[in-house]
Structure formats: structure tokens, C-alpha cells
Design a protein with these regions (language model features):
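Thiol-based oxidoreductase modules, predominantly thioredoxin-like and allied folds used
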Residues: 6-8, 15-49
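Non-catalytic, surface beta->alpha helical segment in thiol-disulfide oxidoreductase systems
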Residues: 19-21, 25, 57-104
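Cys/His/Pro-rich metal-binding microdomains
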Residues: 11-14, 67
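Short pre-active-site segment immediately N-terminal to redox-active cysteine/selenocysteine motifs
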Residues: 1, 5-12, 62
Length: 105
């Protein structure tokens, strides 16, 4: 599972969505995952829950923040390699590799 902690007013989130997420090789990696986009800055109670979860579990409140979970709901990786397509692609590939490694146990 790929979790995207994002915000309505997050300029860097929009940059990633336009410049990186739209690349064919990134979309191919996303096709192998369940994607969840969690908005943390809306004025509703659900966003507050997402923001609290991000801070308590990952000790950060920054956006964008990306996490890949394994089948046991444990974080496999959260270091995205920055906003560079090659680094982000490596992050996704590593998460998929770790997922299948955990799944085969």
C-alpha cells in the first residue's frame, strides 16, 4: 500500500503530482499497489485524524510525505529519494520488492 500524506495547499504535492506521478514508469509502479491519498489540512475531523496518525506514527507533519506499507501494515520504507523521478521510482520499486519479500514468508 502506498500512502500519500498530502494537503490542499501543498505546492510541493502538486509539483510531484504533475511532474513525477504522471510519468509512465511511475504509473506502472503505482499499478502494482493500492494507493491512498490522505489530506491532512482540510477543515474536517477526518483530516485531523490523518494528521495525527502521520505525526504519531511517522514523527513528521510535512507534506508531501509518502509511505509504503507491507502486508502486516508495517512501514517498509518512507525515504522517497526526493522529488526526482529516478529517486522516486527507486523508492517505489524498493517498496514493491520488500512487499513481495514479506509476502513470501
Amino acid at each position: 500500500m502506498f500512502i500519500d500524506f498530502t494537503g490542499i495547499y501543498c505546492a510541493n504535492c502538486r509539483v510531484m503530482e504533475r511532474r513525477v506521478f504522471t510519468l509512465e514508469r511511475i504509473r506502472q509502479e503505482f499499478d502494482k499497489m493500492v494507493l491512498a491519498r490522505l489530506y491532512v489540512d482540510k477543515k474536517d475531523s477526518l483530516s485531523s485524524v490523518f494528521a495525527q496518525m502521520q505525526f504519531e506514527r511517522y514523527k513528521t507533519a510535512t507534506q508531501p510525505y509518502y509511505v509504503i506499507l507491507d502486508p502486516d501494515n508495517e512501514s517498509t520504507i518512507s525515504d522517497t529519494g526526493g522529488y526526482i523521478p529516478n529517486g522516486f521510482e527507486h523508492f517505489l520499486s524498493k517498496g514493491i520488492d520488500e512487499y513481495f519479500g514479506a509476502d513470501s514468508n
